Amino acid sequence: MFSGIGTAIITPFKNGEIDYHALKNFLETQRMVDAIILLGTTGEAPNISIEERDKLIPFVREYFPDKPLIVGVGTNSSHHTMELVKNAEKNKADALLVVTPYYNKPTQIGLYHYYKYISEHTDLEIIIYNVPGRTGVNIAPETVYKLASDCKNITALKEANSSFDQINKVLHLKPETFKVFSGNDDISFQFLASGGNGVISVASNVIPNQMVEMYKNIISGNISNARKIFYTYYPLFKALFIETNPIPVKQALNIMGLIENELRLPLYPANKETKNILEKILKECKII
C-alpha cells in the first residue's frame, strides 16, 4: 500500500460521454503524486457503468503502469460490490477503495461481516472508506482494527470523518503495518503531522505538486515549510467543498482549461457565486 498523496481523480465528461482526450491531459499533471484513486466520490462512481469501467480503468492503468491504482468499488449491496471487485481485478487494479454501505445504515457487526465477506473473495488489498457525512454510518475504530486483525488484505483506512476525537483514536490504535489516510484536505497538515500515512486528496486534482511538497516536508521534519504550504492553499481546500464534491473541483479545473464543466445528474454544475469564488482563489494562489 502506498504512502503519501493519492489523488481522488475526477472523471471528465463531454457531451455526456467520458472525455478521454481531456483525461489524458489531466493525468499528465498527476505524475508526481504517489497514487491514483479512480472511481471514488470525486470520480462520480455511482454514475459510471460497468461498460465504462471496462474502458476507463485500463486507460488509466496504461497511462500509469507503475503508479499504484486504487479503484472504488463500494456500494450498498454486497452482490453489486462483488461485481465491481471482479471488474477491478480483471482490469488490473492494485487495490480497492470500499466505502461503508450508504442508506442501509448497518450496525458495527453488519459492517464487520460486510468487509470480511469482501476480503474473503479477493486477493487485492482493501482500503476501508469511512465518510459518515455521505453514507449516514460511521465505522468505529475498533471495528476497523478487528477487521485488520482478522483479514490480512484489509490494510488501510480512508478516514473522512472530521472529528478529531475519532481521528486521534484511529491513529492511536492503529497497528504498525496498517495505513491511515485522511480524506479531508482542510486538516491534512494536522493529520500528517500527527502520524497519518497520507492523504487521499481532492485538492491534488488542482495542486498535485504542492500537496506532494507539503507531504515531503512533513516526513523530512520541515514542519514550518509544510505549514506554510498548507495555509497558502487553505482557502482552496475550503472552497472545493462550498458545494457538493466534485462540483467545485470540476469548476476549478474548467477555469484552468483542463476539462469541460460537465457532471452527470443528479449532480449539476456550480452556481455563479461558486465560480467567482474559485476564480478569485485560483488567482490569489497563483494557480492561474
UniProtKB/Swiss-Prot annotation:
Q: Which residues form the active site?
A: Y129, K158
The pathway this protein participates in, as annotated, is: Amino-acid biosynthesis; L-lysine biosynthesis via DAP pathway; (S)-tetrahydrodipicolinate from L-aspartate: step 3/4
An example of a Pfam family matching this protein is DHDPS
Identify the keywords attached in UniProt to this record, alphabetized: Amino-acid biosynthesis, Cytoplasm, Diaminopimelate biosynthesis, Lyase, Lysine biosynthesis, Schiff base
Catalysed reaction(s)?
L-aspartate 4-semialdehyde + pyruvate = (2S,4S)-4-hydroxy-2,3,4,5-tetrahydrodipicolinate + H2O + H(+)
Q: What this chain does, per the record?
A: Catalyzes the condensation of (S)-aspartate-beta-semialdehyde [(S)-ASA] and pyruvate to 4-hydroxy-tetrahydrodipicolinate (HTPA).
Q: What is this protein called?
A: 4-hydroxy-tetrahydrodipicolinate synthase
Q: Which organism is it from?
A: Thermosipho melanesiensis (strain DSM 12029 / CIP 104789 / BI429)
